[in-house]
Amino acid sequence: MQSIGIKGIGYYAPENVFTNFDFEKIIDTSDEWIRTRTGITERRFATKEQATSDLACEASLKAIESAKIKKEDIDLIILATVTPDYLAQGAACIVQHKLGLSNIPCFDLNA
């Protein structure tokens, strides 16, 4: 019987930072008000040129490095997002293509 598992994890946070102090400049709020109610101090935003699949590819490459494997060792891609690149097409197949892994299954998990 073949086993299944997660060998590595990775993440990618875009470089564009928007802090609570930035919010203070555009709406009637404060860093303290936001932080005490949400715990959030900053948010990260992708550029207009970056899609969800681009962010997922960056995270995937970090996961591959973390697992100390080659990308060809991957047997399945599962992408979980509420913000796919397109409404009618999943982003997992785009990540699959960008990673050059067309011979394995992939699917999106959306909530």
Task: Name each model-derived stretch.
Residues 72, 86-89, 103-106:
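Short, flexible active-site-proximal loops enriched in glycine and acidic residues
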Residues 47, 81-82:
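N-terminal transmembrane alpha-helices
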Residues 7-10, 80, 110:
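Short beta-strand segments
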Residues 48-52, 106-111:
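Active-site nucleophile and cofactor-binding loops and adjacent substrate-binding regions
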Residues 93, 100-110:
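A glycine-rich phosphate/pyrophosphate-binding beta-strand-loop-alpha-helix module
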Residues 75-81:
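Short glycine-rich or small-residue beta-strand-to-loop segments that form or flank ligand, phosphate
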Residues 1-75, 97-100:
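Conserved "HGTGT" condensation-loop signature of ketosynthase/thiolase-family condensing enzymes
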Residues 83, 87-98:
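Short Gly/Thr/Asp-enriched flexible loops that form oxyanion-binding sites at enzyme active sites
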